[in-house]
Regions:
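Conserved ATP-binding subdomain of kinase catalytic cores across diverse folds
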Residues: 1-164
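Middle-to-C-terminal accessory/interaction subdomains
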Residues: 1-4, 10, 33-36, 40, ...
C-alpha cells in the first residue's frame, strides 16, 4: 500500500490493427484489497506516470473520443471473486463494467474502461481492463477546477477495518452532511442550497447532487449489489466499494457518487451471503436476520445511508419516483432493451478474447480448465 510498493517498469500498447500505440516508462503496483492475496495469482495492477521514470504524464487517447487524453495513473483491473484464476466458474468479465456503463447511459459521471490482453515480462497474463481512477486528477480533467480543491472519499480496507477515508482533500464536508437530517422540507432543500419552499438561495451551497445520488442507488438496487456501498459480508454495518467526489470551492454541484468494483452483482442463484434474484438492497434497514443496515458512526457513513435518511422526506421520495420512472420506462437506461444492448456490446468485445483467458487461467485452481462455454 503506497509508493514503497511501486516498481519501475516499461509499458507498451500494441494495437492488432497496427494503429499507433505508445511505449513509456512508469511505475507499477498491485491494486485492490482481497485480490492482493497470494491465493489469487493473477492480481490487478495500477500504472503511475511520473517524472521519476520519464514523462510526468501519459499523453494518449486511451478511450478515444469518450475520454480525456492525459493521465497520471490508470488501473488495469480484472475479475477476482468470480474468476477462473480464483477457481470460480461464475466468471463473466461483464459485471463490474456493466454498472459503470449504466451510470454513463444515465448521463452521470462514470469511469471508462477498455479490454486488453496483458503480457507481463513477455508472459501472457490474461484479459484485463483499463479503468480510470475516480480521484482528484480525474475530476479536474473532466470538471475543471483545481486538483487541490477536490475532496475524494473512498473506503480504506487495510487490515480489514473498512473505514471511510479521504484519499484526496478532506472529509469535513461529508461530516457536515452526516450530521444533517432531512425530514422537514427546510432541511431537505438545504441540501441543494434552497430555502424551505424549494427556491434557490443567493449564495446557497449544493451539498449533494441529488439526481446523481438517486441514479447511483438505482444502479445498486437494480443489479442487486451486495458489496457496495455497504457490504453483506459485514452484515451491512460497514461501507465498501464507493467513491464520492466534491469540489469544495464550487457550490453548484455537491458530492457525486461512482460505481466501483461491482463484481458482486447480477446473480440468479442464491449463495452465502447473496440471495440471487431475490436480492433486496432497497429495504436493508428492515431485515430481521441481524444483517439490517446500520451506521454506528461517521467512519461508516456511505451513500446508501444518506439515501435512507432522505427517504423520510416526501419531496425526496417523489423525486426518486420520478427518476425511477425516467430510467425504467419509455426507452430509459434501465429498460430491458437498453440493458441487453449494453450487456451485449461488452460481451461482443471479449467473446473471442476469453478463449485466451481460459488458456492462461482456466486451470489455475482445477485440473480440467474452465472454457468459454462455461
Amino acid at each position: 500500500h503506497g509508493h514503497a510498493w511501486e516498481r519501475e517498469c516499461s509499458v507498451e500498447l500494441i494495437h492488432p490493427d497496427g494503429s499507433e500505440g505508445f511505449s513509456v516508462n512508469g511505475g507499477l503496483r498491485i491494486r485492490g484489497g482481497w485480490s492482493r492475496h497470494p491465493e489469487f495469482p493473477k492480481h490487478a495492477f495500477r500504472l503511475f506516470f511520473r517524472s521519476d521514470y520519464g514523462d510526468a504524464k501519459l499523453h494518449y487517447p486511451l478511450f478515444g473520443e469518450e475520454g480525456v487524453e492525459v493521465f497520471d495513473k490508470i488501473d488495469l483491473r480484472c475479475a477476482q471473486n468470480y474468476s477462473w484464476a480464483n477457481g470460480d466458474g461464475r466468471n463473466t468479465y461483464l459485471r463490474d463494467v456493466f454498472s459503470r456503463d449504466t451510470q454513463r447511459d444515465m448521463n452521470q459521471p462514470y469511469t471508462r474502461s477498455r479490454y486488453y490482453h496483458l503480457y507481463l515480462n513477455g508472459l501472457y497474463w490474461g484479459v484485463f481492463q483499463t479503468q480510470e481512477r475516480s480521484e482528484a486528477r480525474f475530476a479536474e480533467s473532466y470538471f475543471g477546477g483545481q486538483v487541490e480543491n477536490y475532496d475524494v472519499l473512498k473506503v480504506n480496507t487495510e487490515n480489514y477495518n473498512y473505514t471511510l477515508e479521504a484519499t484526496d482533500g478532506n472529509s469535513d464536508h461529508w461530516f457536515e452532511i452526516y450530521n444533517m437530517w432531512f425530514e422537514s422540507n427546510q432541511e431537505y432543500f438545504s441540501l441543494e442550497g434552497r430555502d424551505q419552499f424549494g427556491n434557490p438561495m443567493k449564495g446557497g451551497q449544493v451539498h449533494v447532487d441529488i439526481d446523481n445520488l438517486i441514479d447511483y442507488m438505482l444502479v445498486i438496487f437494480y443489479t442487486g449489489n451486495f458489496d457496495s456501498p455497504t457490504a453483506s459480508f459485514m452484515n451491512n454495518k460497514r461501507p465498501n466499494n464507493f467513491y464520492a467526489i466534491d469540489d469544495r470551492t464550487d457550490y453548484s454541484r455537491g458530492f457525486q457518487f461512482y460505481a466501483h468494483d461491482a463484481e458482486h452483482t447480477m446473480f440468479a442463484e442464491a449463495f452465502d451471503p447473496a440471495y440471487g434474484l431475490q436480492e433486496d438492497r432497497v429495504n436493508l434497514h428492515m431485515r430481521t436476520d441481524g444483517s439490517h443496515m446500520d451506521v454506528a458512526d461517521f467512519s461508516a457513513f456511505h451513500p446508501q445511508w444518506l439515501h435512507f435518511k432522505l427517504t423520510y422526506n416526501d419531496e425526496y421520495r417523489m423525486r426518486f419516483r420520478d427518476r425511477a420512472h425516467k430510467h425504467l420506462s419509455g426507452g430509459g437506461s434501465l429498460t430491458l432493451a437498453k440493458l441487453e444492448e449494453r450487456l451485449n456490446e461488452r460481451e461482443e468485445q471479449i467473446d473471442k478474447a476469453i478463449i485466451a483467458e481460459s488458456a492462461r487461467w482456466g486451470d489455475a485452481k482445477r485440473a480440467s480448465p474452465y472454457t468459454r462455454d462455461d
